[in-house]
Swiss-Prot record:
Gene: rpsK
Keywords, in A-Z order: Ribonucleoprotein, Ribosomal protein, RNA-binding, rRNA-binding
Family assignment from sequence similarity: Belongs to the universal ribosomal protein uS11 family.
UniProt record, GO biological process: translation
Ribosomal protein recorded as keyword: yes
Any single Gene Ontology cellular-component annotation: ribosome
Pfam families per the UniProt record, alphabetical: Ribosomal_S11
Function: Located on the platform of the 30S subunit, it bridges several disparate RNA helices of the 16S rRNA. Forms part of the Shine-Dalgarno cleft in the 70S ribosome.
Example GO molecular function: structural constituent of ribosome
Domain of life according to the entry: Bacteria
PANTHER family, sorted: 40S RIBOSOMAL PROTEIN S14/30S RIBOSOMAL PROTEIN S11
Protein name: Small ribosomal subunit protein uS11
Quaternary context: Part of the 30S ribosomal subunit. Interacts with proteins S7 and S18. Binds to IF-3.
């Protein structure tokens, strides 16, 4: 059976976009979208080879952010608004990595959901 090679679809995007960073206690997910909300590129710490507790480190966050930003930069994105959600480590490292690739960060907005005394939180760890 012959294998068919699939060509990646290269689409030019508008220079403006948004970066959504979800930093949980266990992982980091970075999604770059255009103004309409269509995904341009995405990356996560697990996708970049980090496993276990190494996924939630500032270095993993930096590598993940660079991977997603390079792909978006190559497609033509230049200016982004950053939306951060979650309490995880490496939130600042992800933003610095975006600037290092060449994306101009216009605004940074923290959209972490905070309960108005909703669900009971998980019990404290005893290590």
């Amino acid at each position: 059976m012959a294998t068919t090679s699939r060509k990646k679809k290269k689409v030019k995007v508008t220079p403006e976009g948004a970066v959504h960073i979800k930093a949980s206690f266990n992982n980091i997910m970075i999604t770059i979208t255009d103004v309409q909300g269509n995904t341009v590129s995405w990356s996560s710490a697990g996708k970049n080879g980090f496993r276990g507790s190494k996924k939630n480190t500032p270095y993993a966050s930096q590598v993940t952010s660079e991977a997603a930003a390079k792909e978006a930069y190559d497609l033509g994105m230049r200016h982004v608004d950053v939306f951060i959600k979650g309490p995880g480590a490496g939130r600042d490292a992800a933003i610095r990595a975006l600037q290092g690739v060449g994306l101009e960060v216009r605004t940074i907005k923290d959209i972490t959901p905070l309960p108005h005394n909703g669900c009971r939180p998980p019990k404290r760890r005893r290590v």
